[in-house]
């Protein structure tokens, strides 16, 4: 079942040496975040830069902008056609958004893609800043309210930040108990799937000695809102959703800050913008970036087949 109005989610990400762009249509079915539901429309071998991304996505984004301008999309229905009201969203990590929307880089003082909060203010307490205005020209005419707080990167990033400052020996023993291994990448201890397994283990095994247990438990509770299946259960009583959601976010935020953990960018998205997004769009994980992330492995194989091994990072768009 396609959500009504028709919703199209665009996404872009770099995996290995290949940058990919595409879209998917969220559907009310199990495994809606499967990579088989993701339509890969543009791929090039090379880094994430504004110039390369604009070249690689020019035709793709022009088509999307025409939908945004019209507000609907003509679709075949039965023996004829019908114009369907259409909403377009974009999901990407905090490194991709500046290249697509021209916002400040995630390492800037005004690091948030959605507001102009100052980094020092965010470090002191949960807060937000004036709503950001996108400067012309921009590649996509998507309103800021339709930029997804990326669920996979947020939950994974917050989990890994806690693990980074946890006792190494305890962490090693816990990984053994959960039957997971640390990622080979220095920038990320656990992948999204293993990170979720770890959070579940912490919650279901209260007898284990775990650093930052309360915060990890609160993070697990937050992660349930990112699960497509769990979200349906959590929102059966629709009237209570805003209060319960805000309560979960506030409890997690307070625990994180009480533990004096680093106030990273992803924490700000949760504290200042996540509740508004979920309430406005009636969902979170269903708009997530899992599909394109799962394509990275296939993309690496495709890159080798299309471009050959050891190619220079010249723009090659398919």
Please give the residue ranges for each predicted region.
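A structural signal for the principal folded core domain
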Residues: 1-318
């Amino acid at each position: 079942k396609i959500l009504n109005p028709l919703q199209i989610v665009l996404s872009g990400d770099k995996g290995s040496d290949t940058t990919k762009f595409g879209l998917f249509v969220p559907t009310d079915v199990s495994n809606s975040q499967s990579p088989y539901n993701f339509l890969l429309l543009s791929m090039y071998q090379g880094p994430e830069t504004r110039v390369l991304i604009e070249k690689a996505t020019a035709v793709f984004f022009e088509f999307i902008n025409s939908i945004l301008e019209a507000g609907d999309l003509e679709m075949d229905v039965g023996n004829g056609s019908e114009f369907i009201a259409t909403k377009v969203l974009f999901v990407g990590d905090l490194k991709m958004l500046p290249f697509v929307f021209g916002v400040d880089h995630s390492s800037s003082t005004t690091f948030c893609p959605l507001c102009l909060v100052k980094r020092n203010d965010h470090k002191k307490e949960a807060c937000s800043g004036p709503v950001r205005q996108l400067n012309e020209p921009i590649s996509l005419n998507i309103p800021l309210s339709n930029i997804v707080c990326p669920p996979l990167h947020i939950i994974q990033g917050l989990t890994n930040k806690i693990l980074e400052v946890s006792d190494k020996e305890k962490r090693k023993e816990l990984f053994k108990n959960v039957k997971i291994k640390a990622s080979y990448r220095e920038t990320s201890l656990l992948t999204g799937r293993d990170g979720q397994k770890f959070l579940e283990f912490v919650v279901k095994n209260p007898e284990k000695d775990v650093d930052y247990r309360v915060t990890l438990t609160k993070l697990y509770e937050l992660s349930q809102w990112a699960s497509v299946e769990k979200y349906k259960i959590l929102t059966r009583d629709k009237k209570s959703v805003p209060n319960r959601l805000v309560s979960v976010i506030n409890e997690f935020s307070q625990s994180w800050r009480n533990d004096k953990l680093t106030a990273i960018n992803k924490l700000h998205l949760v504290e200042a913008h996540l509740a508004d997004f979920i309430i406005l769009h009636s969902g979170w994980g269903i708009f997530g970036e899992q599909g394109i992330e799962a394509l990275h492995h296939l993309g690496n194989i495709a890159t080798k087949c299309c471009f050959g091994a050891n190619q220079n990072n010249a723009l090659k768009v398919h």
